[in-house]
Amino acid sequence: AFCGLVGLKPTYGRVSRYGIIAYASSFDQVGPVTKNVKDAALILEVIAGKDEFDATLSSKAVTEFSNLQAPKKNMRIAYITETIETEGIDPEIKAAMYNRVKALQADGYTVEPVSFPYLKYAVPTYYVLTTAEASSNLSRYDGVHFGYRSPNATDLESTYKLSRSEGFGEEVKR
């Protein structure tokens, strides 16, 4: 991460999404943000596993992620060149990334750059998919049955309009 933290996005079905307001179901996942990989593994051990309120969960046993040791021999790690060699990356961040690559290589890992020329399409693709899912998932938050109800509404139509325009954030209103 560019901020010195470890973010872990678990495999779909590993951690319950029960209690989360669905924005874009195929993207919504729960995972820890920690100071190091070991802490992320420990938290994943706690939050992973069965939940009777989430039918999408895997029944596979939870691994002791914190006890896993990556074999250095024959281990290949790739990084996407376009994430580092792009306009706007702070020189200190770039240097830290390349220093980490060197440290991993010194530890015995094979670290290679890979190009992903389609990276520029990731954000537009994200918005196409998530806005479609969000419009479906959030449609029930009408200010009548679910969600925020505007105190400024005077009739049913203004309840819908004001509750959604006042109650939803900018990301949802795109």
Would you name each region that the model predicts?
Residues A1-G4:
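FAD-binding core of FAD-dependent oxidoreductases
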Residues V6-A95, R100, A153-L162:
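A short helix-breaking turn/cap at a secondary-structure junction
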Residues P71-R76, A132-R174:
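Short helix-loop capping/hinge segments that flank enzyme active sites or metal/cofactor-binding pockets
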Residues P91-I93, V123-A132:
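Short glycine/threonine-rich loop-to-helix capping motif typified by GTGT followed
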Residues D107:
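Conserved dinucleotide-binding and phosphotransfer motif residues
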Residues T110-S115:
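General small-molecule cofactor/ligand-binding pocket signal
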